[in-house]
Regions:
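Extracytoplasmic small-molecule ligand-binding "clamshell" domains
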Residues: 1-53, 196
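Flexible hinge/capping segments at coil-to-helix
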Residues: 70-72, 82-99
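Periplasmic-binding protein-like
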Residues: 73-81, 146, 150-191, 209-221
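A ligand-binding cleft/hinge motif common to bilobed small-molecule-binding domains
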Residues: 39, 56-64, 111-114, 131-168
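Ligand-binding clefts/hinges and TM-proximal coupling segments of bilobed small-molecule sensing domains
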Residues: 107-122, 161-165, 191-221
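Extended ligand-binding regions for polar small-molecule ligands
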Residues: 13-22, 91, 106, 173-211
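Alpha-to-beta junction loops
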Residues: 26-28, 45-54, 97-99, 135-145, ...
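Short helix-initiation/N-cap motifs at beta->coil->alpha
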Residues: 30-42, 87-88, 122-132, 136, ...
């Protein structure tokens, strides 16, 4: 989502549209439902949505309750800081007085505690709130997956992604448990998008001009 306009847009949105056309025909349209880290799985399990294409990391715990596609994005946790920041990597945050901003319900919180245990983590309900806190000086860095931070940086001059990825957290498309045939169809469509160049075009569109972002690494899946 564009945190300035409130509009649902981004790499995942374009991927959802491209996948829908591959699976159901060029005239097919997708209905987009905005989710948060906390609501993704409940909405899926309650059949309010058919699939989650929303920066969802494939984890063993989640595999117990949902089915995942093949990885479609080489995500990893990174840092967003002002351009004039002296912070270069996650280890620079591992000292008393450092405050890191993150979103509740994401893997980011536990990872910061692991890699920078001396830092304090402030948790927010969504990425817009976390970035607002960064702008107002409530913390030295915001941390979550590289793709999300890249989107924020591209819309907000004066901020950059630093430190590379200090975790490996590939994104997958999730459907409800037991829908293995749907996953096969999604994987086939993903393979076709990669083969015809659509996937690489979307990577370049959304991440190609973001300072500090590893485009090649994101596309490795």
């Amino acid at each position: 989502m564009n945190i300035k306009t409130g509009q649902i847009e981004g790499f995942d949105v374009d991927m959802a549209k491209a996948l829908t056309k591959k699976m159901y025909g060029k005239d097919a349209k997708v209905k987009l439902v905005q989710t948060t880290a906390k609501t993704k799985i409940p909405l899926l399990k309650n059949q309010n949505i058919d699939a989650v294409i929303a920066a969802m990391t494939i984890t063993p715990e989640r595999r117990k309750i949902v089915e995942f596609s093949q990885p479609y994005f080489g995500a990893g946790q990174s840092l967003l800081v002002p351009d004039n920041s002296t912070i270069k990597n996650v280890y620079d945050l591992n000292k008393k007085g450092m405050v890191v901003l993150a979103v509740k319900g994401t893997t980011a919180v536990a990872n910061i505690h692991k890699f920078a245990p001396k830092a304090k983590v402030l948790e927010f309900d969504d990425y817009g709130q976390a970035f607002t806190a960064l702008k107002s000086g409530q913390g030295q860095a915001m941390s979550t997956d590289n793709g999300i931070l890249a989107g924020i940086a591209s819309e907000n001059p004066g901020y950059q992604v630093v430190g590379g990825n200090f975790t490996n957290e590939p994104y997958g498309i999730a459907v409800d448990k037991g829908q293995t045939q749907m996953i096969k169809r999604i994987d086939k469509a993903l393979d076709e998008l990669k083969a015809d160049g659509t996937y690489d075009k979307l990577i370049q569109k959304w991440f190609g001009n973001v300072k500090g972002f590893d485009v090649k690494g994101a596309g490795e899946r």
